[in-house]
From Swiss-Prot:
It holds the Pfam family Conotoxin. GO terms for cellular component: extracellular region. GO terms for molecular function: ion channel inhibitor activity; toxin activity. This is Conotoxin ArMSGL-0121. Residues 1-20 form the signal peptide. Disulfide bonds join 52-64, 56-73, 63-77. It is found in: Secreted. Residues 21-44 form a propeptide. Belongs to the conotoxin O3 superfamily. It comes from Conus arenatus. The modification Leucine amide is found at residue 78. InterPro entries: Conotoxin (IPR004214). Expressed by the venom duct. The presence of a 'disulfide through disulfide knot' structurally defines this protein as a knottin.
Amino acid sequence: MSRLGIMVLTLLLLVFIVTSHQDAGEKQATQRNAINFRWRRSFTRRAATEECEEYCEDEEKTCCGLEDGEPVCATTCLG
């Protein structure tokens, strides 16, 4: 094989390695962002649930969740 052919193959291999490494980094960053989002969402939901339970406890009812940011209290929750 000529030197030009070897140089072209080496260049193609180098381009392939660099692009696959970048793709792996983007996938890892996407996964990390998804995990962070899930954690923040669960933390927010937990805080809202505690507030709802405290609010409904004063009325001696069960917290059924939040609707439009307001706690929904009932003796028994449906669905």
